[in-house]
Swiss-Prot record:
GO terms for cellular component: cytosol. GO terms for biological process: prolyl-tRNA aminoacylation. The keyword Zinc does not apply. Consists of three domains: the N-terminal catalytic domain, the editing domain and the C-terminal anticodon-binding domain. This is Proline--tRNA ligase. Catalyzes the attachment of proline to tRNA(Pro) in a two-step reaction: proline is first activated by ATP to form Pro-AMP and then transferred to the acceptor end of tRNA(Pro). As ProRS can inadvertently accommodate and process non-cognate amino acids such as alanine and cysteine, to avoid such errors it has two additional distinct editing activities against alanine. One activity is designated as 'pretransfer' editing and involves the tRNA(Pro)-independent hydrolysis of activated Ala-AMP. The gene is proS. Homodimer. It catalyses: tRNA(Pro) + L-proline + ATP = L-prolyl-tRNA(Pro) + AMP + diphosphate. It comes from the Bacteria.
Length: 564
């Protein structure tokens, strides 16, 4: 491809709304352009990269036995109402009506659509197993689309769905998909972690995320360097060290004037934070109030709380709601509280604790569970953090940020039961199909790759993902010999099967080098002043090679260094 004929609108300045490297370089390099908030156009360079990523995904999905389909983007509301997700998704779901007032959604995922397809066509165990996937545009009305392709309102996703006769078979399929995902992300050259994850609005029995390690990532991960345990903080567990037992002391109400925060109470009473217990009042699905107890040095994990109640939404009670319950803000405690009380595991063997007295300016000291108040049970409700003991080997956990690029779920019968997707087994009994679902953020992968492959000048594409294999720069296209040599090398490399970009534009050498660094093609041949001595310069974008090579040897030299 000749640069003079190619559409590559590079920019000298960073976009005003771009803060992460991938957003900056993909826009500046002419890979993408924003049409509206969270909606992007893929220009020729960007589309070439996208297609290469899609082909790698297709290869491994096909090799795993999955079958490619293409489902409608527009899905009838009736299907979403069958599973209850019409209401669960809330404002994130794009909804519309046709001219007959029939309701539809623009699909953010396709569990309902694929389950409808299967229930209409599967009757017997002989029709199973099935494993489908598609690569398709999805829609989600994000409240705050940001970071370019990382969080958009329109995005490209690989979503897959498996259907099995038993949970045992479904787990085997899940493992096959898990291995396929490992192969995909390794071929993409990503430094990633597979972590335990929360099932979220998709639902199901368990799930894993594939998270690319980047500083700008929105996913917070804890992991163990020793045993390999890793989990999203929303789902992460940790080992609870047992505190030494104590003899219960007499409970006592103490005056704590206008002291509300746990840190201030601990300092005022001269006790460690581990002796304080926070009593948090939450509203579940905007209906019922509950009290949640957590140790003073820990933070409540709202995702774990929502999962405990199988709730769509949990939120802390407002000051007005606390007043309506007769509870003063800042002094909430479990004693005499007329609400169900749920405690974190960390309180199970905690004695002589400090709690609010449900009275302004007062706390109780030496309160004890069972003697002074009852709880409905002990649950894993705390957020794991760096330094907590690993739940497997008990060594300290580490914390990092990352970008979720893949998510797999064992759904069980969540969708098949609600949508009546049944099959008849060998014994003639009707049973629900066991499902799994498997997603990859295809367009997000472009950003993830750039986040890990860039420097202060631009992108450094891996060889198998670069929009072109080789970039030839003719620094002085007005010199006929330089132009002839450039075209000769261009022709020979194309005959070798390489995809080559020849920059023969009438631009300054500086502009060409800046564009070349920005778009990040891994191999570069520079035709400049050294041609007078019969040499051209061979460079690798990552800076590992920069040397003069005889013109007659440049093809062999490049082919020796090419591994795409």
């Amino acid at each position: 491809m000749l640069a003079s004929k190619f559409f590559m609108p590079t920019l000298k300045e960073n976009p005003s709304d771009a803060v992460v490297p991938s957003h900056i370089y993909l826009v500046r390099g002419g890979f993408i352009r924003s049409l509206s908030a969270g909606i992007y156009e893929y220009l020729p360079l960007g589309l070439k990269v996208l297609r290469k990523i899609e082909n790698i995904i297709r290869k491994h999905m096909d090799d795993s036995g999955a079958l490619e389909v293409l489902l409608p983007i527009l899905t009838p509301a009736e299907l979403w109402k069958e599973t209850g997700r019409w209401h669960v998704y809330g404002k994130e779901l794009f909804r519309l009506k046709d001219r007959k007032d029939a309701e539809f959604a623009l699909g953010p995922t396709h569990e309902e659509t694929i389950t409808d397809l299967v229930r209409k066509n599967v009757r017997s165990y002989k029709d199973l197993p099935l494993n489908f996937y598609q690569i398709q545009t999805k829609f989600r009305d994000e409240a705050r689309p940001r970071y370019g392709l990382i969080r958009g309102r329109e995005f490209i996703m690989k979503d897959g769905y498996s259907f099995d006769v038993s949970e045992e078979d479904a787990k085997k399929t899940y493992e096959v998909m898990k291995e396929a995902y490992h192969k995909i992300f390794k071929e993409l050259g990503l430094d990633y972690l597979m972590v335990e994850a929360d099932v979220g609005a998709i639902g199901g029995k368990f799930s894993h995320e594939f998270v690319v390690k980047v500083p700008s990532g929105e996913a917070h991960i804890v992991y163990c360097e020793k045993c390999g345990y890793a989990a999203n903080v929303e789902a992460a567990k940790f080992h609870h060290h047992k505190l030494p037992p104590e003899e219960p002391k007499p409970i006592e109400k103490v005056y704590t004037p206008d002291i509300k925060s746990v840190e201030d109470v601990a300092n005022f009473l001269n006790v460690p934070l581990t002796k304080l217990v926070k009593t948090l009042i939450y509203k579940i699905d905007d209906k019922d109030f509950v009290a949640v107890l957590i140790r003073g040095d820990r933070e409540l994990n709202e995702t774990k709380l929502a999962n405990l109640f199988k709730a769509i939404d949990v939120r802390m009670a407002t000051k007005e709601e606390l007043e309506s319950l007769g509870i003063p803000e800042g002094f909430v405690g479990p004693i005499g509280l007329n609400l169900p009380i749920y405690a974190d595991f960390s309180l199970k063997e905690l004695y002589n604790i400090v709690v609010g007295a449900n009275e302004k300016d007062y706390h109780y000291i030496n309160a004890n569970i069972d003697r002074d108040f009852k709880v409905s049970g002990f649950y894993d409700l705390a957020t794991a953090k760096e330094g907590d003991p690993c739940p497997v080997c008990h060594l300290p956990l580490k914390e990092t940020t990352g970008l979720e690029v893949g998510h797999i779920f064992l759904l069980g019968t969540k969708y098949s039961e609600s949508m009546k997707a049944y099959f008849v087994d060998k014994d003639g009994k009707e049973k629900s199909i066991i499902m799994g679902c498997y997603g990859i953020g295809v367009s997000r992968l472009i950003s993830a790759i750039v986040e890990q492959y860039h420097d202060d000048k631009g992108i450094i594409w891996p060889e198998n993902l670069a929009p072109f294999n080789v970039h030839i720069l003719v620094l002085n296209p007005k010199d006929q010999e330089s132009l002839n040599v450039g075209f000769d090398i261009y022709k020979k490399l194309k005959e070798k099967g390489l995809d080559v970009l020849l920059d023969e534009r009438d631009e300054s050498a500086g502009a060409k080098f800046k564009d070349a660094d920005l778009i990040g093609i891994p191999h570069r041949i520079v035709i400049g002043k050294a041609l007078k001595e019969g040499k051209v310069e061979y460079q690798k974008r990552d800076g590992s090679i920069k040397e003069l090579v005889d013109v007659k040897l440049i093809i062999n030299k490049l082919m020796d260094g090419y591994h795409g």
